[in-house]
């Protein structure tokens, strides 16, 4: 068997390439409990951003119980950036629950919202998710911030 010696810079470059190829996707889900009997008020979540270069995919995440029976949901989503800019939009999203088993009492619904988002400022982003009409069976609502590969 032959010993192969690598130049230290070449070895470091190979190690970096392997780390980049095998990196774990960062996934941060931030949720707030809501009134399960009648969700009408905003669920407010806060996300601390310290990376202004990574692209992220955002999904609305709902934790629901068996009382939830909607097939779609109308939401007002309002975002405030660290430099106080505000953006509000109304969206209607498909949001049917997919129950993992007959005995499951709760499940999560993840609804794609935005792809390839770059947070240009470091600091705290505040997202408010408000249903346009009363929703029954939602226990918590929030956003999944997932780094895009």
Predicted features by range, described:
Residues 18-21:
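C-terminal motif of bacterial Sec signal peptides marking the signal peptidase cleavage site
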Residues 23-26:
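Bacterial signal peptide processing site
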Residues 43-73:
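Post-signal-peptide N-terminal segment of Sec-exported extracytoplasmic proteins
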Residues 53-60, 116-133:
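Noncatalytic modules at the cell exterior or secretory-pathway interfaces
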Residues 66-67, 109-119, 131-140:
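Short acidic/polar inter-strand loop motif in beta-rich domains
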Residues 79-80, 133-149:
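Exposed low-complexity, polar/acidic, P/S/T/G-rich flexible segments that act as propeptides
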Residues 89-120:
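An anionic, turn-rich surface loop/hairpin at beta-sheet edges
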